[in-house]
Amino acid sequence: MAQALLNAGFGNFVAADRLIAIVSPDSAPIRRTVSEARERGQLVDVTCGRRTKAVLIADSGHVILSALQPETIAGRILNSRGDLSGA
């Protein structure tokens, strides 16, 4: 079975089927989640030095920081699944 990969920006790809959440990094609980993932060694930063605009949370506990907007990432997932309704 082929694994669906999601372009997380700057030539970096993430397994789309493993994602459980795509959130904005602005709230205190998400900042705490990012900090805890860094301490556990499960933080993946794919921003290439740019500002973090989305935090992707995987079912394995890994937290991925992306410089793309959450809406952009969600749109890419919907497009890859063939669901263009956006709902």
Curated annotation (Swiss-Prot):
Pfam family, one: RemA-like
Matches recorded under InterPro entries: RemA-like (IPR007169)
NCBIfam families: PRK04323.1
Similarity field: Belongs to the RemA family.
HAMAP family xref list: RemA
Name of this chain's protein: Putative regulatory protein Synpcc7942_1027
